[in-house]
UniProtKB/Swiss-Prot annotation:
Pathway: Carbohydrate biosynthesis; D-glycero-D-manno-heptose 7-phosphate biosynthesis; D-glycero-alpha-D-manno-heptose 7-phosphate and D-glycero-beta-D-manno-heptose 7-phosphate from sedoheptulose 7-phosphate: step 1/1. Its EC number is 5.3.1.28. The lineage of its organism: Bacteria, Pseudomonadati, Pseudomonadota, Gammaproteobacteria, Enterobacterales. Substrate binds at residues 52-54, 65, 93-94, 119-121, 124, 172. This is Phosphoheptose isomerase. It catalyses: 2 D-sedoheptulose 7-phosphate = D-glycero-alpha-D-manno-heptose 7-phosphate + D-glycero-beta-D-manno-heptose 7-phosphate.
Amino acid sequence: MYKKIISSELDAALKILKNFLKNEEQIENIEKAAILIAKSFKNKNKVISCGNGGSHCDAVHFSEELTGLYREKRPGYAAIPISDVGHISAIGNDFGYDQIFSRYIESIGLPNDVLLAISTSGNSINIINAIQTAHRKKMKVIVLTGNDGGQVKHLSDVEICIPYHGYSDRIQEMHIKIIHILILIIEKEMKKIN
């Protein structure tokens, strides 16, 4: 009954993946991002992740794979998603939703920590504020974006952008794949010291 839809959806995802694979700069940026995060862990720093909606779920998933395990047993790594409901509702109420991430980073971010900011559009004001706060705190910034990268494109140390101008779910599908690759490379880098 829905086989055509299923095939069409999988085919569309495959086309985006194949196009991304042709972009050598973005492939290099994935490697740079993973090495940057591993270097932070090696130096006893942490990675803080944030995003809105589905990107928020990706930020949480990224952190839980690092504090727990991905494919192999190993020590947990210092990864914190900005996902505390009490914090989000308090800051949203008292300061505004545009500051829910930046206030958290202001509170716990340290020099040489890493912020992984995830935004399919690259234009979410609370993500932009988080990035600006991270820079003030002398943190490194990695962004996972889509479309043309939006406003965050020029605010990051490393940008990984899915150049797709359609529904955001296609971008999110690529983001979760990239997140898993980042974790795989981080684990390999961390093995060099363990």
